[in-house]
Amino acid sequence: MKKPNIILVIASSIDGRLSFPINQSAHIGSFEDKKILNNAISKVDATIFGSGTLKVHQSTFLIKKFIDKTKFIIKDSQPISIIAGNPNNFQKEWIYFNQPIKRWLINSNPKKINKDLNFDKEFFYKNSWLQTLANLKKEGIEKIALLGGAKLIHSFMMEDLIDEIKITIIPKIIGGKYIWLPHKKHEKILDFNNEWIIKSFKQLKTNEIFIHYAKKINRFLEF
């Protein structure tokens, strides 16, 4: 069973937090980190994040041509945006549903379908993420950037589906509960022989460090 290449793209504080305890929607990284994200998603066919992340941000990051920190041009070519979860509480007024992108939904609850939402395609979660991702590959999706949140990252980790990690370490101690890999069932993740090699790294101007990891041994079996 073949799946797309899964690339986790995140910014994390030194203490492993994805967002601030109070203002979850605020980006914890700098403008330099935004350029890292911009470059990462320009190289994939699709991005995926969970319904909880969409509820917090109500939009997705679009590929841009940056002129400076405040001026940019949104590029015409954008990856497909895939949302995973229950769409029942989504609001069609959110910016996301008016952004110039193709929107796909992986519905975790087929009984709860909001037909008013502007999704181009709808899929259903099938038994495991491996099987669900295999269905996406059949649709021509070869590379997916996994953008969060923690629950979805955890689900992918539990099935050992992540092939690469692009992480920016932000020089801040934030605290709070929003860690990028939940403690729940963490010991099962450590049972995997997860060894990673550094493909590249870069110290950014803002004392942030970007590291690109890839699996040392691809344990994913195709059958």
Predicted regions and their residues:
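Enzymes that bind and transform nitrogen-containing heteroaromatic metabolites
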Residues: 1-223
